[in-house]
Every structure is written in structure tokens, then in C-alpha cells.
Amino acid sequence: MRTKNSKIINSEQDIFRNKVIPIKFLSNYNNEILKKPQWMKIKFPVSTNKIKNLTLILRQHNLNTVCEQALCPNLAECFNRGTATFMILGSICTRRCPFCAVSHGKPSLVNKNEPQQLARVIFDMKINYVVITSVVRDDLKDRGAQHFSNCIQEIRNKNNVKIEILVPDFRGMMRESCKIISMNPPNVFNHNLENVPRLYKLIRPGASYIRSLKLLEFFKKLNPNVPTKSGLILGLGETYKEIVHVINDLLDHGVTILTIGQYLQPSSKHFPVQKYITPDEFKKIKNYALSIGFKKVFCGPLIRSSYHAEKYFE
């Protein structure tokens, strides 16, 4: 059953509200650091030469990756394979989510040369599948949609690659932003719901569960041949019943690719892990999602939204 649309608050008021939101934890949540189970142990590659080389290339071209900014647990593996998820529009987010490691505050000016720089690096690295994401830019009139479109166009002008974009919610400009991106549509359109609606005020201040669903649905309506994708991170206090509800909502709004992974606390200043989901629990969730009609489901402790993203086309 679809959820009714919600009222969108004035964007300038939203921006101010996000600047003053304190990260605080409620007394009915576990604030203790849970011991990591064995299945969360990460194996690092023996050689780090490829990691160093890729990092050097990124710095030379003044490019950011969400792998680094969000402290992704798969960074070593992906960098060692020569892959990365590029983060455009700077490294400073205009929102402050207590589960996220990306820096927040007053963002920098948009680098107009970034699309060309990005296309050049992708060409030099001989990448066949690229994932592009961004920080939230509530300060920009179009929320960064035109910059996404410019990046896609520049990459296609220079490279024969498949492009996946992982976008923010374009608050207050959702329809306009989707139309802009539809001028240069990606091969896959991704927007993460992150978690269940009950926890949104706590972990996603400034975001709206309904708005995110509407974004995915509207883009699919404009681009029926482009697969839409979304992801969740678990271990924030959600229940299995709530997870199932979100999975149903995503399918009902046209999403066919799903990623689900374990939340990891970036630092002691971030929201603490409430539970480590077991591999068997992840398997149960994956089987449910596949049983109701999802085409691809990547579900496991270390899964992230862009992890092995190219496998959708295999």
C-alpha cells in the first residue's frame, strides 16, 4: 500500500534547521559500544601499491570518493581492484546525520571543471562501470542536479562506460531535479532510504521517508527503462517487521535493485550500533526480497550501496 505524500517545508528554513541540529542519543537506545562479531572482521590486501596509486590519482585531479569520506569498510578491497565511488559537489554536506561520517557545515563553491576532471580520470583508469554520488547540497537552487547531468554527459563524451548515480533527495526541487537528470539519464538511478521511517527523525534529520519514495517513483516514471535502486543500513534499532515494510514500499514504488548492509559506527561521536545483524538474518531478508519480485538483492554484513555495483549487468 502506498503512502500519502507529505508537505515539503520551505528550503531556507530547512537549511537553517539542519545547521543547528545537535547529534544526541536518546535514553531508550543503547549507548554502549558493542563488540564486533567475527563475521565483521575485514581482510586487508597484502599489497597496498594499487591503493596508494589510486589515492595519488584522486588527489592529483582534486577528486573525492565516498569510500574515503564515509569511511567505507570495503575501501581497501575496492581501491585494490582499481574501483571507487566518486563523490562530486565537494566533501562538505549541508546536513548532519548522526550515522554518517561525511563532514558537514558550509560547503565550498561548485568546481565547474569537475565533470571534465572526472571523465579524464575514468578514461585513464579504464573503468567500465562508474558510480557517482554527492554530498547533500541544499544550498544550491537545483540541489546539484545540473552538475550530475554535466558529469554524465562529459563521461559519455569520453568513455564507453555504464554510469550509476547515487543521489540525495533534492529536497524541495525533486521533480525539477529529476527532469534535469533525465536529459542525460544514467544506466542505474540510486537513492538510499537508509532505514525505517520510525527512525528518520533520529538518524536522518531533514529527510523524509515519503519524499524519498516519491523521488524514486517519479524518476522511474520519467525513465521507465532505467533501473532504480535503493539501500538500507541495519543495526540502528529497526525491527524485522519494519524492514519488510520498507522492502514492500520500495517494490511498490518501482525499485528493482536492493542493497542491505550492517551499520558501523564511524566514531564515538556518532550514533552507536544497536545490534549486529547475523549472516543468517541477512539471508532471510534477502530471500524475502527476492521472493516478492526484486531482480537483484545484495544483502550482507559488509554490503554497501555501490559495492560490486557492476554485477547488476552480469
Curated annotation (Swiss-Prot):
It comes from the Bacteria. [4Fe-4S] cluster 2 binds at residues 93, 97, 100. Its cofactor is [4Fe-4S] cluster. It is an enzyme of class 2 (transferase). It holds the Pfam family Radical_SAM. [4Fe-4S] cluster 1 binds at residues 67, 72, 78, 306. GO terms for molecular function: 4 iron, 4 sulfur cluster binding; lipoate synthase activity; metal ion binding. It is found in: Cytoplasm. Its EC number is 2.8.1.8. HAMAP family: Lipoyl_synth. This is Lipoyl synthase.
